[in-house]
Amino acid sequence: MKIAIVNDMPMAVEALRRALAFDPSHEVVWVATNGAEAVKYCAELTPDLILMDLIMPVMDGVEATRRIMAESPCAIVIVTVDRQQNVHRVFEAMGHGALDVVDTPALGAGNAQEAAAPLLRKILNIGWLIGQRGSRVRSAPQPLRSGAPRQSLVAIGSSAGGPAALEVLLKGLPKDFAAAIVLVQHVDQVFAAGMAEWLSSASGLEVRLAREGEPPQSGKVLLAGTNHHIRLLKNGTLAYTAEPVNEIYRPSIDVFFESVASFWNGDAVGVLLTGMGRDGAQGLKLMRDQGYLTIAQDQNSSAVYGMPKAAAAIGAASEIRPLDKIAPRLLEIFAK
């Protein structure tokens, strides 16, 4: 994979170079010391992946991410020395299209390969996404066997650009919205709680992490909160699971949508928002095949038109709508 590094700290650049050297398939194609340089270099030679710092002179990583995704789009992972201190900047960058975030590997760590492992795992996952490898063949959902009372559910999946898209969508819904909402966003579990808090603050709705064994409930907004998949069980409750292991990116939107298609006992709408790759497209198709309404975000309003495009290509979306029209549509569907 051709990788670029954007960081103004020589020690951080060296730490990243050493970490990448553990995988000979990775090649550093250029290094920029600030965001403005990165925008320029990316236009001249667009890499497969950029490892982007947040705080830099001239232009920071948030603005650089915005510019690059608008002008020379490619996969971007935020690499920072203190994720928790920079949580709001991280979500800003993800709103502009960054895919993930990871700590800068420690230079001179006792076990250098172990220190590099989290970064290399992220890069492996990103490679799977940008490669857009074919999805596994999925069987049709099993007949509904849930004895849970009938309710309404909105199942939402998002990836690159998702935080900002979710903010817009949730802002358009009232606090007494008539359906349960479950969000599956590609975000590391370290950041899931922070993202729930950020979405709560930004949208005005109460957003919290989904708990093992709880059912979706009307008026509640639940966010998948671990690096395992989240799925609906036939008794109507939510569960985290490591299976299927062949779904590399976790949590998988496909896994959740498929479980809704199989086991949800009530009205439901599937919504697939901005994101890179194909995750969610097949699951959305299964929801549509089961008679549920499905919505994909349109190209013009998507930060990254990958997942919604894949859904549109296979006929998974009943409707394709601009982001700002999705919440009004949900209000129409679930009007009290």
UniProtKB/Swiss-Prot annotation:
Active site: S159, H186, D279
Cell compartment(s), UniProt: Cytoplasm
Any one cellular-component term (Gene Ontology): cytoplasm
Single biological process term from Gene Ontology: chemotaxis
Annotated signal sequence range: none
Listed Pfam families: CheB_methylest, Response_reg
SMART domains: REC
Molecular-function GO terms, alphabetical: phosphorelay response regulator activity; protein-glutamate methylesterase activity; protein-glutamine glutaminase activity
Residues recorded with modification 4-aspartylphosphate: D53
Post-translational modification summary for this protein: Phosphorylated by CheA. Phosphorylation of the N-terminal regulatory domain activates the methylesterase activity.
InterPro entries reported in the protein's UniProt record: CheB-like, CheB_C, CheY-like_superfamily, Sig_transdc_resp-reg_Me-estase, Sig_transdc_resp-reg_receiver
Domain comment as written in the entry: Contains a C-terminal catalytic domain, and an N-terminal region which modulates catalytic activity.
Function: Involved in chemotaxis. Part of a chemotaxis signal transduction system that modulates chemotaxis in response to various stimuli. Catalyzes the demethylation of specific methylglutamate residues introduced into the chemoreceptors (methyl-accepting chemotaxis proteins or MCP) by CheR. Also mediates the irreversible deamidation of specific glutamine residues to glutamic acid.
Protein's name in the database: Protein-glutamate methylesterase/protein-glutamine glutaminase 1
